[in-house]
């Protein structure tokens, strides 16, 4: 059984069913529509249509018995977990690229949650069994720090910090091209692409989507690429990937947002061949969650800053690209 209530803090023209795709992941949009039509999901206590446009102040109540959650057993799996920090309430893990965070319809094994269940006796279950312990997410191909909570109380404490934007995060990335400014801010509104709900679009119009903001600093600028540090202020899905793509400097290897093989075609044939080889060799997008700073639970206000070492494949990629330009 999934029981939850969401309050809409801003009206941005988003449909109810699309809004819940992210909130109720991995339940499909078609399944969510069925629940809405069957009155298992209400807005302000009333039955509405899946296409209902959410308004500021709306209360969305979800009370569903989800077969996906019930039919996927969360089996403990022995796997190497790189623990960066642990206390009685919080766990910080250095997630490798390629590791999916939690089970879903297509992958009920080999996820970070399966590993956490094996290694830790206590994990929060506030977001259901499929997301045991998980406070926030990283894309499968993104490596780096991710937080998990051992208790529901600690989970709510951490979630509150994310919502209030007091958690400070730094991401390291390799991007295409030359940046116009060494330091800057990318801000605007992000929304799901209607033709493909797994991807997002960016707009400067406030009515289109959720507000997003990312600060950035170009650490090293090379001829055809750059090493960039991103400091997300908000935490929208795919935010850094969407932002870097929007300004014309997509993340190296990011096929979804213009940083893949097609980007290499903009260069001379010999460079295109070289970049294609590097893209195939690297096999993912070059984005790493490098550091996180937050307030520890029941610590009297003590903050902690954690770093996750840059992965070896990331270091090799930068050295290879740099070597080709020298």
Predicted regions and their residues:
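Short Pro/Gly-enriched beta-strand edge/turn motifs at strand-loop
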Residues: 64-66, 196-199, 211, 271-277
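Short histidine-centered loop motifs in beta-beta connectors
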Residues: 45-47, 223, 228-231
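Short coil-to-beta-strand transition motifs
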Residues: 73-78, 204-214, 286-287
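Short beta-strand segments enriched for Tyr within beta-sheet-rich domains
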Residues: 158, 236-244
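Pseudouridine synthases involved in rRNA/tRNA modification
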Residues: 1-31, 79-81, 220, 233, ...
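Short, conserved beta-turn/loop elements at beta-strand boundaries and strand-helix junctions
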Residues: 180-181, 195, 220-224, 297
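RNA pseudouridine synthases
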Residues: 1-194, 301, 310-322
């Amino acid at each position: 059984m999934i029981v939850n209530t969401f309050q809409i803090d801003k009206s941005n023209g988003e449909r109810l069913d699309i809004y819940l795709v992210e909130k109720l992941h991995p339940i499909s949009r078609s399944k969510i529509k069925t629940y809405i039509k069957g009155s298992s999901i209400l807005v302000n206590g009333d039955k509405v249509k899946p296409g209902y446009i959410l308004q500021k102040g709306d209360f969305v109540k979800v009370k569903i018995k989800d077969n996906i959650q019930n039919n996927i057993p969360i089996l403990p799996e022995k796997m190497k977990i790189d623990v960066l920090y642990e206390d009685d309430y919080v766990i910080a893990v250095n997630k490798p690229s390629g590791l999916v965070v939690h089970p879903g319809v297509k992958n009920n094994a080999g996820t970070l949650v399966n590993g956490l269940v094996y290694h830790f006796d206590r994990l929060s279950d506030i977001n259901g069994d499929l997301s045991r312990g998980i406070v926030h997410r990283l894309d499968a191909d993104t490596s780096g720090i991710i937080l998990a909570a051992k208790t529901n109380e600690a989970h709510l404490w951490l979630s509150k910090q994310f919502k209030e934007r007091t958690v400070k995060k730094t991401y390291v990335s390799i991007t295409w091209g030359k940046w116009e400014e060494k330091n800057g801010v990318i801000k605007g509104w992000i929304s799901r692409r209607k033709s493909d709900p797994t991807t997002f679009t960016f707009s400067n119009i406030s009515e289109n989507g959720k507000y997003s903001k990312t600060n950035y600093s170009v650490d090293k600028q090379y001829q055809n690429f750059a090493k960039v540090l991103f400091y997300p202020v908000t935490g929208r899905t795919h935010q850094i990937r969407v932002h870097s793509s929007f300004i014309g400097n997509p993340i190296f290897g990011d096929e979804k947002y213009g940083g893949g093989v097609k980007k290499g075609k903009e260069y001379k044939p010999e460079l295109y061949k070289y970049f294609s080889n590097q893209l195939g060799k690297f096999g993912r997008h070059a984005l790493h969650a490098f550091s996180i700073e937050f307030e520890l639970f029941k610590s009297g206000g003590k903050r902690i800053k954690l770093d996750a070492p840059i992965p070896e494949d990331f270091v090799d990629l930068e050295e290879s690209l740099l070597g080709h330009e020298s």
